[in-house]
């Protein structure tokens, strides 16, 4: 029984750390447009609420997921209220920009990385505002 609890604990820790964003070394190329990642997709699906907001639901539990998620090679952030964020957001003392509308290679709500935002601010390879 004790081994089973330890095993479940390790499985939980591994699943939680796999969902945290990890970023590659920053390079000096800066463009405008899409940002993609090679991180594995989070195990869930998008649900559109009546108020027009999006939530990401876990396929395992059926509950909303919170924090950083990856969907179709894009980073998103789900707030504590279960809704996808858009626009400029302060997360853990850093400022990020999430697409306010779908544009070429940049879906609604996806994190801008190593680019200029539509309002012409630069974000680094981690998506953090550089200016």
Describe every region a protein language model picked out:
Residues 4-131:
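Extracellular adhesion/carbohydrate-binding repeat motifs centered on closely spaced tryptophans
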